[in-house]
From Swiss-Prot:
Keyword Translocase: no
Protein family membership: Belongs to the globin family.
Sorted UniProt keywords: Heme, Iron, Metal-binding, Oxygen transport, Transport
InterPro entries: Globin, Globin-like_sf, Globin/Proto, Hemoglobin_b, Hemoglobin_oxygen_transport
Record-listed heme b binding positions: 64, 93
Pfam families, alphabetized: Globin
GO molecular function: heme binding; hemoglobin alpha binding; metal ion binding; oxygen binding; oxygen carrier activity
Protein name: Hemoglobin subunit epsilon-2
Stated role: Hemoglobin epsilon chain is a beta-type chain found in early embryos.
Top-level taxonomy: Eukaryota, Metazoa, Chordata, Craniata, Vertebrata
SUPFAM superfamilies in the cross-refs: Globin-like (SSF46458)
Encoding gene (name): HBE2
Every Globin domain range: 3-147
PANTHER family xrefs: HEMOGLOBIN FAMILY MEMBER, HEMOGLOBIN SUBUNIT EPSILON-2
SS bonds (residue pairs): none
Length: 147
């Protein structure tokens, strides 16, 4: 289990309160699909993902990105039990979707990059460390059901 300090909890929660989930989620997922094009295979139903502009303008990418980032909101509410919080999603991604668990870490990195671009002044090294710890812990929780 990952332990978050009071300072880390405050840092994560204070920034999260300012996050536009739709914008940051959509940009994070779009960035993942562009930077790591092999991840596109999990999103065949999204239609045209053949270019950066197609991905950035794809409404399904934005909607799903919001859904993914909302799960981080759930993580922030349950930072003391991330494995329990993500148990069902871990099982889904492992047993049904067969997602390479490395993709969770990659997406976490994309979220950090997008947060840094949107909140550059507030995204101090301490803020980054707290968010990096959270994204790593979520990625770890999502791999919990993998065999």
């Amino acid at each position: 289990m990952v332990h978050f300090t009071t300072e880390e909890n405050v840092a994560v929660a204070s920034l999260w309160a300012k996050v536009n989930v739709e914008v940051v989620g959509g940009e994070s997922l779009a960035r993942l699909l562009i930077v790591c094009p092999w991840t596109q295979r999990f999103f065949d139903s999204f239609g045209n993902l053949y270019s950066e502009s197609a991905i950035m303008g794809n409404p399904k990418v934005k909607v799903y990105g919001r859904k993914v980032l909302n799960s981080f909101g759930n993580a922030i509410k349950h930072m003391d039990d991330l494995k329990g919080t993500f148990a069902d999603l871990s099982e889904l991604h492992c047993d049904k979707l067969h997602v390479d668990p490395e993709n969770f870490r990659l997406l976490g990195n994309m979220i950090l990059i997008v947060l840094a671009t949107h909140f550059s002044k507030e995204f101090t090294p301490q803020m980054q460390a707290a968010w990096q710890k959270l994204t790593n812990a979520v990625a770890n929780a999502l791999t919990h059901k993998y065999h």
